[in-house]
Amino acid sequence: MHEHAAGNPLLQPWDTPYGLPPFTAIRPEHFVPAFDVAIAEHRAEIDAIGADPAPPTFANTVAAFDRSGRRLADVGRLFGNLTSSETSPALQAVEMEMAPRLAGHDSWIFMHRGLFARISALFENRARLELDPEPRRVLERIHSDFVRAGARIVGADQARYAVVMERLAELTTQFGQNVLADESSYRLVLRDESELAGLPEFVRAAARQAGIERGIDGCVITLSRSHVVPFLTFSDRRDLRERAYRAWISRGEHEGPHDNRPIAREILALRREQA
C-alpha cells in the first residue's frame, strides 16, 4: 500500500457493495493526496509503455495505454460528480488547485515522445496490422487525439501549449464556479398564493424546502435547474417568470466578484492561440 494511503479512503480498496466509493468516509482533504498518488502512478505507467523495448503492438501500446490511469480515472470521476452535484467551498478550493495540474498532466501524456512514437508507428502501419474494425478505429482515434492535443509540436511551442492548456483549465473552472455562485445566491421569494399560481405541488414543495434551508419565511426559487426550469415551465405569473429568466441568462454577466466577462475574453484569446 502507498505511504499516503493510510487514513485516506480514496487510496484504499473500495470494499463497498458494487465497488461504489465509500461516500460517508470521504472528505475534501482526501482528494489532493489521492490525485498526487494517482498522477504519479499514471506517469509511471505511461513511461513504462513508452520505454518498452519490445516492438509496438496493439496490445503492448494501445491497449496498455487504454488500461493506464485507472486510479486517476476513478478519483477524477468521483470528484467531478461531487463538485457538480454536492459542491462546497472546500471542494471548490480543491477544484481550483487541481484543474491546472490535471491539464498539465494531460499535456504531459499527449506530448510524451516515447508513447507517441509507438502510437505513430502503429498508425503508419495500420494497413498491415490486420486489425479488426473496432481496434483499428481505436488506434485511429487515439492517434488523432494525440495529434490534436499537440503531440507534433516541438520546442518552445510545446512548452507554451502546455501553459495555455493549464491556464484554460484554471479559467474554465473559475467560470463555472462563478456561474454556480450566482445560481446559489439568487432568491426569488414567493409569499402568497397569487405568486405560486400554476405551480404543481412538487415545485411548491421544492421551493418551500429551499426557503427553510435559507431561513426565509416563504417559498424560494433559486437558479438551480431543478428550481428555475419547472418554475419557468409552470408559473402563471409572466412578470415573475421574466424576473427569473433575466436572472438566469445574466449569471456571471455583471459587475462584482463573479463577473465572467473578463474571464471569457481571456478564454477566447487563449483558444485562438491554441488553434
Feature-to-residue mapping (PLM):
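Zn2+-dependent metallopeptidase catalytic domains
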Residues: 1-275
